[in-house]
Amino acid sequence: MTEFFSGNRGEWSEPYALFKLLADGQLYLGDSQLNKLGIVMPILSILRQEKNYESSYILHNNSQNIIVTYNNEKFTVPISGFQEKAVLLLSEIKNASGNRAFSIPSIDDFLKKLGFTHLSASSSSKSDIHIVVHDLRTGITPTLGFSIKSQLGSPATLLNASKATNFTFKIYNLKDKQIEYINSLSGIKEKIKEIFSQDGKLEFVKVESCKFSNNLTLIDTKLPEILAEMILLYYSSKLNKIDDVTEHISRLNPLNYNLSCNHNYYEYKVKHFLNDVALGMRPDDVWLGQYDATGGYLVVKEDGELLCYHIYSKNSFEDYLYCNTKFDTPSSSRHDFGHIYQVNHDFFIKLNVQIRFL
């Protein structure tokens, strides 16, 4: 019995992106609102890692063929073939629903001919494909790694939640009976709002994980406090978009920065944080400030068009992350947070968030 490749909409978006790139022959840079900037980088070749070997796709001058090499195999495929398969893939992805896995038998032989061993890259890597481009502004031909983010599937996660991303807060001004009642409430946001409605106070104590705390401090010494303020605002209000939460915190200015000259302290630091998460920083690992081998993100838009965001255009990349992400509440039981607990005579609560794309 023949086994077909199977994946959800996000996983199928990876071969779609490859075929679309080979058909277009160039990368389009995008702005924060997912519009083309008018800056184009011609593609020279694309590299994709399979299980035991690397496949390369070379766009040769003005040829209408792509040179494909992998595992001692070398052959050409007409660009029109990638165009046709990209159209087919996009239609099948759009017709799928939910996050279920599905197969596309009509494209299976083409994938196997190209040496595909899987649809999507390993989750341990931040880069899904590597692209050699001709940067017309500098004249150089760098190899850039890209993570593919698809709007055709479920929203991707930028910062994954874990116990390492718990933030601990101390509770003041509440009596035992009040604590008991608040703990009986089911929703975490409901608990936080009730703490404040009963004149309670929450004070940030620490980031639960020493590694994550140090990673944040490496980015900016005040970043743990800034994120703690943002997390509190998220759980005590209807705000969830990163840019909205940051702007609100900026107006409150809880860290008492000197704003007399209109410096965007909070926005600058949050953008730096998002950039570093996107390019290598993981909460569970010691991070030394070195970016992963990635150039940035390739975004598959809902209409199938591709936009590129990379560290060569750092401002556009950070603006994209800032304007297209939001806080989300992860599983409290899995990550052990959202319950008031007592240590000696003091009460504490841990709060946790993950950051998703819109």
From Swiss-Prot:
Keyword set, alphabetical order: Endonuclease, Hydrolase, Nuclease, Restriction system
EC number from the UniProt entry: 3.1.21.4
Catalyzed reaction equations: Endonucleolytic cleavage of DNA to give specific double-stranded fragments with terminal 5'-phosphates
InterPro entries (alphabetical): Restrct_endonuc_II_HpaII
Biological-process GO terms, alphabetical: DNA restriction-modification system
Domain of life: Bacteria
Subunit structure: Homodimer.
Protein name in UniProt: Type II restriction enzyme HpaII
Species, as recorded: Haemophilus parainfluenzae
Organism placement in taxonomy: Bacteria, Pseudomonadati, Pseudomonadota, Gammaproteobacteria, Pasteurellales
This protein's encoding gene: hpaIIR
